[in-house]
Amino acid sequence: MGKVSANNQSGFFKFYIDTALLLNAEFISSFTNCINSEYNGKVKISYSSSSQQFKVIVYEEHKREAFSLFEEIVQKLKRESTVYKKPRLDIHPFGQLHYDFTTLLNFQRYLDLGYGIEDVKIKENEDIVKSKVGKKPTSSDFYIPCLIKPKIITPFEWEGNFKQVIYSPTVYNGSFKRLFYLPDNNDLLKEFAHATNTKYKASLKDNKIVVLANNDQDINAMLEKMKHIENLVSQKVYEYPEETLVYAGKIAPCQLKFLKLKFENEILYTAMHTTSIFKSVFNILGSFYTMRLLRNKHDGDSYELVPVFAKNPSKTPPCNDNFKIFSDDIKLIGCKIFAGVSLNFSSPKPAHRFYELNKTSSNLSIPVLQKPSNFHSSSTELSDNSIHQGRRAVDPVVNQNNPSNFEEMIMNKLNKLPTIDKQILGTSSLTHFQDKTTAIEHSINKSNSKQPPRFKFQLPPRPTSNTLPLEPEEELVTRYSVSSDGNTVDEAITKQSQTFQLVNSNEFNEVNANDVHKSLRQNCAKLDFDDSKSKNLLSVECLELDKGSDCSTPKSGSLTPSIDMKFLRLQDEKMDDLGDNYYTILMSSNPVSSYGVGSLYLFQPKIVCSEKYINHEEIDNMNLKSLHRWLSRSLHVLQSFSGEIELNLEFGVILYPNISSDVSACSHGFMNIYKDLNLPRSYFADCITKSVSNIDSLLNTPVKILFGRTEYTYPLIEHEVLDSKNYFVFKGSLLFTDDKRNKTEDSTVFFSMICSSKLDQFAFYKDSKQSSTCTINFPLALWDSRLRIETKVPLNDAILTEFSKSIRFRNVNKDLLLVFGNMEDRVIIHSVTRINENSVPFNKNLLPHSLEFILKCSKVKSYDISPSSINSKEAFVCLDRSKESKPIESCFSLSIQSVYMQSQFKYNNSIRAGETAPWKLANKQFIGGAITENVSDLYTAAIIMVNQLGGIHPTI
């Protein structure tokens, strides 16, 4: 915004420049000194921090060249500020206040039309307006307008008695016109006054507002709204306490977290649905639980887990699609073994090489062994669908009771196969090869060899990781069958494919309520109520339904709730079954066990639910876009950390708070950053979805970034798989003995053990609770951001090595089991999960200085741990259930990694070893000096200043 006024009586011309820039005191001082020195005697420039304007004074003797001097100064300011930092595109959360610098040069347009300093004429068809109301402008007194004209508040007369309070901004250092006057000519003060039945008098000169009302209540309401907006614009945290609730279901892996936002309405809660809500101990088909929130003035807030039974559900939840990144259309994973084809491993682009081979795969013939008639058809892969491609089975005519004949037959079959390159044998993805230099190492070495432009990075050599490499080879799993005499007999040698198909079967059975209740009572009679799990379930209470609903509170010794509910959905407007007590805010319908449907519901009082949040599809869309923006921003922030770090996200469902209309309008402030992304109208950008299709959409949705006035579109990731892994994760506790000073002390250490899918490589980590939380200020928007960093500490102990040797595969009753020693005296296993992980690179166009970040897309399956009936010292998990049982549900996770997180960030040797860049807003070397480089404009500047974006970041 530029304003020029000339006054011959005062002897000089005055120009005012509203820069719309985010500048610090150092730059302002340097720029003003430079201009005053260069134009000494002609121009004097000063800066007002209150109005955030440059005032340029041109002396009388140089009035003829006043406009040319002003143009030169504006161009210098534009050029210098661009080098220091890009123009701030958004200085107000309610709308775009970015003024084009060409507007400031409109004076030259009037000069080109023949108007001089002494003979300026006012015409109705021109954009020149009067500077003073009721006074005809003279040749020496004129006003040049800009894009947006501020409103002028005229005083008014109040009739009758009234109370008044004088308000002026206290937190915000600037004029209140920037707070309450929007660029679309909307006046927030007028809207607030209408909503609170008040009136006001505004004085732009004194920067004060006089609030008038008939009572104190209306005045306080008006003041609260104005202070609220002032806090938002000044980026003050407005009461965002964060709380972590108790675990629901199985305690160890499940966590519920919510953000409490205090506004005009009552608080709403954010809940995350996780697959860790385990099955019922009653093993009843079709059973699931409902979680509700209890409000107690004395005890606070608490959750209760209530068993609920579905009867004739009206709708079946839609099945989720596969990830496109793992589908066959893109041809990323599932490389076949070729015969008679040699690979050139010297090629710098392994992915391109495998793509070429994939085109010729259809012309190659591979001998396939016949499958025995008594071989079960269910797959042992992670995929929910049975995939038999690449399996090797035996001839049905072979007598499998004779191990020697069976082994001889297998060897004969294998000898008939063509000769296969050893380096080709065992590959499971198109970009993975067993060489000393893998594809991922190649990309890391390439990244380390690059020097960031015009910025001094000092990165030490890549540290040697204690993590054992987990080769994603296609494994040969020996299946066993146990005869009646206890002898194990080889049944078949099967090869397990690494094809990653993310199929989530959302099916559930319609059961009769009476049959369920009858079965429930029968199973309750068999329960051991001394068991801790039974006690947890017996402590729950039923929902307080209407009088017409049948609900009995469970009592000690018998749990017989008689709850008859319909399967409610978010879009259901009528909640007849719940009555007037509760309103269903969140409903999810993903199965959590092989015995039925598991759903996590959140019930809220009906009075606090907004009608606009009933449509869950809109909420899902906002969640997806929010996560999309969060991921793209996180890439820049992560490079400042040192150590072995992983930032993880697990997908759930999050609701947005029921915010008021004035706060909702704030979301339009950062619309100009992503024009086509309707960002969620919320203060936190955290949120995620359980839907596989939404994750697929996330990975394939382009990121739109605004560079100055030009918008660029980049895909979030590159469709190239750098690495693929399939491994198990055991989590447990170890009784650790430490001998110091002849004193033996026993302590329990919680650990994680990563085991390759072939059970031949292991890595042990101590579950360190040391985690750091980094908060980053973000002045351009209203959300907070928090990055939670957790480190891994290697753990070496002989007892864990001994335990790892006890892990093996076994086939019992057509079910593939993973058996391990139950060493309760030293090692106790709490959970077992299987992870299929693919690593894909982010688009380098989104990264500063071509840093190579990797996105890891994983499918995680959790299993039950059951004691072995054959050997009391063993336990097992069932990896491949028979067709009669439904597969255990999988969850999907994303993690971000970079080689720069394993090195030290430095800037001109000013940061010592073991330190990272200070988290300060004015630190220009922060995030690799991205804001000092002309590379990413506002986008990069925004990324380095986000304040507390975290929320739910559970690790696997």
UniProtKB/Swiss-Prot annotation:
Record's protein name: RNA-silencing factor ers1
Organism: Schizosaccharomyces pombe (strain 972 / ATCC 24843) (Fission yeast)
Keywords: Cytoplasm, Cytoskeleton, RNA-mediated gene silencing
One of the GO BP terms on file: regulatory ncRNA-mediated heterochromatin formation
Protein's cellular compartments: Cytoplasm; Cytoplasm, Cytoskeleton, Microtubule organizing center, Spindle pole body
GO CC annotation, single: pericentric heterochromatin
Function text: Involved in RNAi-dependent heterochromatin formation and centromeric silencing. Required for the conversion of centromeric pre-small interfering RNA transcripts into small interfering RNAs, histone H3 'Lys9' methylation, and the recruitment of the RITS complex to centromeric sequences.
Signal peptide: none
